[in-house]
């Protein structure tokens, strides 16, 4: 009897695990320039214009993010630097990127088996982005404004636009003193007015977090739907002469 109960428990546990299916992410570069895609977890991949990268992510993955790096130069061993989004000088990222970089963030199979996903500008902005579930029943997030071109002078950075937290490093902008310790500012409103669905500061949750279930996802750099048929967008501020 005891063995039967144990076997039933193990079978039930395995069944629950199997129902929490993994998700596939298609990462597509529709920019007119090369983007070095990065993912944590996942690593990194050079994407020339029109190229894509398929990433299979395990069920239950959380605190995950995908971003694009610009103006990179890597040697044959995958060591080098990027102007924006650099992750410790490696093509294959094992940690998070250096601001400024537009982020697609997600956590799979969380509360009530829901996926949580968002676009965040808390680390600033470098590339316009779409983050969308393949399910038509869930919300498509877009951040395609010309933030680099309109960036306030104090937030400007080579190749992108910093979030004020990166520049000032105070609770007013970083919310380091906990929930309710900060609110929107003139700088967060600059981002929010241009990308209403994206996080503009760390406690911008109510209008910036979305949920879906049982779906795969697409992350698109320079999505064409809002940029015209060619998918053109202002190039990063400084382009390297040799791309690896």
Swiss-Prot record:
Keywords: Disulfide bond, Signal. It comes from Arabidopsis thaliana. The keyword RNA-binding does not apply. PROSITE patterns: THAUMATIN_1, THAUMATIN_2. One of its GO terms (cellular component) is secretory vesicle. This is Osmotin-like protein OSM34. Residues 1-22 form the signal peptide. GO terms for biological process: defense response to fungus. Disulfide bonds join 31-222, 72-82, 87-93, 138-212, 143-195, 151-161, 165-174, 175-182. Belongs to the thaumatin family. SUPFAM superfamilies: Osmotin, thaumatin-like protein (SSF49870). The keyword Membrane does not apply.
């Amino acid at each position: 009897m005891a063995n039967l109960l144990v076997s039933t428990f193990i079978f039930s546990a395995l069944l629950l695990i199997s129902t929490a299916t993994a998700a596939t992410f298609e990462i597509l570069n529709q920019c007119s320039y090369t983007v070095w895609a990065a993912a944590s977890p996942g690593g990194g991949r050079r994407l020339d214009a029109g190229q894509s990268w398929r990433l299979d992510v395990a069920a239950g993955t959380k605190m995950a993010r995908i971003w694009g790096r610009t103006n990179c130069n890597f040697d044959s061993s995958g060591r080098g630097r990027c102007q924006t989004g650099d992750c410790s000088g490696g093509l294959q990222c094992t940690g998070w990127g250096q601001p400024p970089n537009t982020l697609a963030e997600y956590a799979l199979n969380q509360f009530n088996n829901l996926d949580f996903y968002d676009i965040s500008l808390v680390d600033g902005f470098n590339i316009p982005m779409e983050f969308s579930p393949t399910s038509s029943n869930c919300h498509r997030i877009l951040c395609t404004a010309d933030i680099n071109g309109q960036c306030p002078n104090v937030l400007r950075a080579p190749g992108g636009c910093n979030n004020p937290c990166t520049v000032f490093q105070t609770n007013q902008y970083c919310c380091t003193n906990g929930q309710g310790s900060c609110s929107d500012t003139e700088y967060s409103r600059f981002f929010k007015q241009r990308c209403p669905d994206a996080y503009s500061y760390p406690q911008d949750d109510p209008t910036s977090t979305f949920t879906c279930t049982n779906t795969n996802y697409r992350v698109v750099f320079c999505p064409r739907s809002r940029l015209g048929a060619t998918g053109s967008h202002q190039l990063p501020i400084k382009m390297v002469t040799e791309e690896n």
